[in-house]
């Protein structure tokens, strides 16, 4: 969907339900290189997505907790392109539902490369050195409101935009981070050599090898 936003001189392609109506693995990969945009008090804050993780409820062992929560399970099984703000270790994490209705799935936005409004982001992060290289950090840097949960994209103050496609050779595919179940599934995507990813591929692979006893 191409729309005019007041912060653009030319039309941009804003991601909507059609983009997210695919499997979580497809959406997680396609989101690499896209932009996250937040308008805060008239200022545009933005970042290029450099890291994502896919979660597919029915066949994903890591989703054992949300299966017990009827509200979350219903949200993940509903229409694609809807915000799901997951809370972990007292921090909010940004997820977007995907796949067809009835197929519980989402994609976690793990890291961004800032492209606009960096000074304001640093204020929101209270001067922290690590700005958006982690799922909780980017939520804080963009002042994403947990009250937005269950609302469809795009919102007036928050949306995603298509970006330049990132070639396959520049995208790494690894296991996900910090899981106790489903940790062997290669459902994480990250831009190779990006200083903004939350964990280097070497660290992730080393951790996976140790947990496997290799």
Curated annotation (Swiss-Prot):
Enzyme kind, highest EC tier: hydrolase
Keywords: DNA damage, DNA repair, Hydrolase
Pfam families, sorted: Pur_DNA_glyco
CDD domains xrefs: AAG (cd00540)
Superkingdom: Bacteria
A biological process from GO: base-excision repair
GO molecular function, one term: alkylbase DNA N-glycosylase activity
Statement: the UniProt record of this protein carries the keyword Ribonucleoprotein: no
Known EC number: 3.2.2.-
Keyword Transcription (UniProt): no
UniProt xrefs under NCBIfam families: 3mg (TIGR00567)
Family affiliation: Belongs to the DNA glycosylase MPG family.
Protein name: Putative 3-methyladenine DNA glycosylase
Phylogenetic classification of the source organism: Bacteria, Bacillati, Cyanobacteriota, Cyanophyceae, Gloeobacterales
């Amino acid at each position: 969907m191409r729309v005019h936003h007041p912060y653009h001189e030319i039309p941009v392609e804003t991601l909507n339900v059609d983009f997210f109506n695919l499997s979580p693995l497809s959406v997680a990969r396609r989101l690499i290189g896209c932009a996250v945009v937040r308008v805060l008090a008239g200022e545009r804050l933005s970042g290029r997505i450099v890291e994502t993780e896919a979660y597919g409820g029915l066949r994903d062992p890591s989703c054992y907790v949300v299966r017990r929560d009827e509200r979350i399970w219903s949200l993940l099984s509903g229409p694609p392109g809807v915000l799901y703000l997951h809370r972990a270790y007292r921090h909010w994490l940004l997820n977007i539902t995907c796949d067809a209705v009835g197929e519980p799935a989402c994609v976690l936005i793990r890291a961004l490369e800032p492209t606009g409004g960096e000074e304001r982001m640093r204020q929101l992060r209270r001067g922290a050195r690590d700005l958006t290289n982690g799922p909780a950090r980017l939520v804080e840097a963009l002042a994403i409101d947990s009250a937005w949960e269950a609302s469809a994209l795009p919102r007036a103050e928050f949306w995603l935009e298509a970006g330049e496609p990132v070639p396959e050779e520049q995208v790494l595919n690894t296991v996900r981070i910090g899981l106790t179940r489903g940790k062997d599934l290669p459902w994480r995507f990250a831009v190779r050599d990006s200083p903004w990813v939350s964990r280097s591929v070497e660290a992730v692979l080393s951790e996976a090898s140790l947990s496997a006893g290799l």
